[in-house]
Amino acid sequence: MAGAEGFQYRAVYPFRRERPEDLELLPGDLLVVSRVALQALGVADGGERCPHNVGWMPGFNERTRQRGDFPGTYVEFLGPVALARPGPRPRGPRPLPARPLDGPSESGHTLASLAEQFSPPESAPPILVKLIEAIEQAELDSEFYSRPELPAPRTDWSLSDLEQWDRTTLYDAVKGFLLALPAAVVTPEAASEAYRAMREVTGPVGLVLEPPTLPLHQALTLRFLLQHLGRVARRAPSPATAVHALASAFGPLLLRAPPPGGEGDGSEPAPDFPVLLLERLVQEHVDEQDTAPPALPPKPSKVKPAPTALANGGSTPSLQDAEWYWGDISREEVNERLRDTPDGTFLVRDASSKIQGEYTLTLRKGGNNKLIKVFHRDGHYGFSEPLTFCSVVELISHYRHESLAQYNAKLDTRLLYPVSKYQQDQVVKEDSVEAVGAQLKVYHQQYQDKSREYDQLYEEYTRTSQELQMKRTAIEAFNETILIFEEQGQTQEKCSKEYLERFRREGNEKEMQRILLNSERLKSRIAEIHESRTKLEQDLRAQASDNREIDKRMNSLKPDLMQLRKIRDQYLVWLTQKGARQRKINEWLGIKNETEDQYSLMEDEDALPHHEERTWYVGKINRTQAEEMLSAKRDGTFLIRESSQRGCYACSVVVDGDTKHCVIYRTATGFGFAEPYNLYGSLKELVLHYQHASLVQHNDALTVTLAHPVRAPGPGPPPAAR
């Protein structure tokens, strides 16, 4: 440091002013710090070369001509300069901001801070609100959010052509918005509190991420986004799977760095803590939306008195006998039962609170499921105080004739169409195995035809979506090119006037013609680019319209596909319960029966190695370890392991030489791969069934049975590997 009056540094990262005394930085800014200032900070000779070790440094920004403080972690040392600057003003200690992780960000790709984008009573940034409103007006689909690739940085956030965006662009824009924020929504300090709450508290973690732990604007934005993700998960066929996928996609975006560790017990957050935290938060919102419906307004004073006979309990039908009472079923099954049903369709189930006497009425209204809690106290039931009905049956019977609008103006319907638990068995109308099998063949063929049509539409939709994105990128490139050419034209026009006047005085007609010709060429080129951009914009609008039509056709096919699959599954369950052989079922489904393996030749089924759990259950291993165990094994070799989803298991099986993984759900009715097949009392029962039953009924790509336990003696690698 001796001999130098000052030192020069160059900004590597952009920095926004946090305090009045701070300097704004842009990459490339040159900053000068005096030797006296560094000495006042206690920096030894040579320490100036390591600004990241100095901390906050007082200096002079040569671009803005301003003095102030800047973080040493955001700059690099250039060398000494022969400049003398005034010494530093006294200041207290201050923590450094976190250094950006991924290098310099491009100017224009960063949005303003959340505090600058909106103010209460607004609930979220207007850009985010518009994007999510557009998504929810279309159709919620967690698969679009779950794509692993990150969107390209966006420079235009005006959303002027939002109505032309396809679903992929909309979903990517939400991710892009979070990436473009200058700071993560969840601060490291708030994440640290959430980590502590997840380890020590059994209640909701979301309560921790409220002001003052999380700044107000971040807390409002987080709450708004979680409510949206909760709705996305609830609409998914498997909400639990959707919650995990959404958490994997959004966790790293909302919490860009893990919280500081160093708890008293020495524990530190796992690398996947952002995913675990968001999974917990989204699940809390899903549970809140489902299991805690708001109480209805107070009941009007004019209430019909309960009939005397019912009040005495003499003629009240049993709740268990009511066709609309489904007992303890999951919300996923309720959503499935009420899917695509008319307004007024309803059923009653046990409340998720598991408190005896409490139930939940699910009513279809406006194309959505409305949840109404049935309260119980002192032998009386109702939707709100006063509780005047002597049984749930009486309550439901009353509102099959009276509108619920007296409680809530939006519920202007009666309980019109009960979803009957008895009708579920009447879907199969044939009375013989052969007749049911023949009808199964018809339904399966219809399902395959619809599936092929949907797959073709999906491929077309994906292709056109990619083309639309390419055209949008091309239009942005045209805009940049036009801007460059117009600036060049303005510069040329300004210079041309001077040269034309000069050559006119000199009488140089040739040079004057050359300048005028160049000017005309430039104008012509700009006109051509404008014309090309206009044509591309017209093509974009037409293709966007076609893309929306494809999307509509796909959405119109979904109910048919789900209904056909539901009917086909019910026929399969009926045949399985009646003891139909899997070989015969495969013939009806058009599945080729493979050559008998060594286990199918066993006359005594009790001799199967599948009866020994140790031959196929491997406990807690991950996907990679499972794939290593099944490497070079023949088709049908399998194992069962613990799943990364809490309370579930996973089956890993070799299909066409590749290892596939599928979740085994554990529900109140038993184990299974999907509803309504969750029927097996144990994993062993499930394995024994699928030893001869193909998994293709659950996934068209799984044309295999659980033939060979991975640890069973017997068949080795496939013939090609020997």
Curated annotation (Swiss-Prot):
A single BP term in Gene Ontology: protein transport
Record carries keyword S-adenosyl-L-methionine: no
Region (Disordered): 83-109, 287-319
Phosphotyrosine modifications at: 458, 599, 649
Ranges for domain SH2: 324-419, 616-710
Residue ranges constituting the SH3 domain according to the UniProt record: 4-80
Keywords: GTPase activation, Phosphoprotein, Protein transport, Repeat, SH2 domain, SH3 domain, Stress response, Transport, Ubl conjugation
Keyword Phosphoprotein: yes
Molecular function GO labels: 1-phosphatidylinositol-3-kinase regulator activity; phosphatidylinositol 3-kinase regulatory subunit binding; phosphotyrosine residue binding; protein heterodimerization activity; protein phosphatase binding; receptor tyrosine kinase binding
Compositional bias (Pro residues): 87-98
A Pfam cross-reference name: PI3K_P85_iSH2
Gene3D superfamilies hit by this protein: 1.10.287.1490, Rho GTPase activation protein, SH2 domain, SH3 Domains
Swiss-Prot/TrEMBL site (Arginine finger) positions: 147
InterPro entries cross-referenced by the UniProt entry: PI3K_P85_iSH2, PI3K_p85beta_SH3, PI3kinase_P85_cSH2, PI3kinase_P85_nSH2, Rho_GTPase_activation_prot, RhoGAP_dom, SH2, SH2_dom_sf
Domain Rho-GAP: residue ranges: 112-289
PTM info: Phosphorylated in response to signaling from activated receptor-type protein kinases. Dephosphorylated by PTPRJ. Dephosphorylated at Tyr-649 by PTPN13. Phosphorylation of Tyr-649 impairs while its dephosphorylation promotes interaction with FBXL2 and SCF(FBXL2)-mediated polyubiquitination.
GO cellular component, one term: nucleus
Family: Belongs to the PI3K p85 subunit family.
Record function comment: Regulatory subunit of phosphoinositide-3-kinase (PI3K), a kinase that phosphorylates PtdIns(4,5)P2 (Phosphatidylinositol 4,5-bisphosphate) to generate phosphatidylinositol 3,4,5-trisphosphate (PIP3). PIP3 plays a key role by recruiting PH domain-containing proteins to the membrane, including AKT1 and PDPK1, activating signaling cascades involved in cell growth, survival, proliferation, motility and morphology.
Domain comment as written in the entry: The SH2 2 domain is required for interaction with FBXL2 and PTPN13.
Subunit details: Heterodimer of a regulatory subunit PIK3R2 and a p110 catalytic subunit (PIK3CA, PIK3CB or PIK3CD). Interacts with AXL. Interacts with FLT1 (tyrosine-phosphorylated) and FLT4 (tyrosine-phosphorylated). Interacts with NYAP1, NYAP2 and MYO16. Interacts with FBXL2; PIK3R2 is a substrate of the SCF(FBXL2) complex. Interacts with PTPN13; dephosphorylates PIK3R2. Interacts with XBP1; the interaction is direct and induces translocation of XBP1 into the nucleus in a ER stress- and/or insulin-dependent but PI3K-independent manner.
Name assigned to this protein: Phosphatidylinositol 3-kinase regulatory subunit beta
The encoding gene: Pik3r2
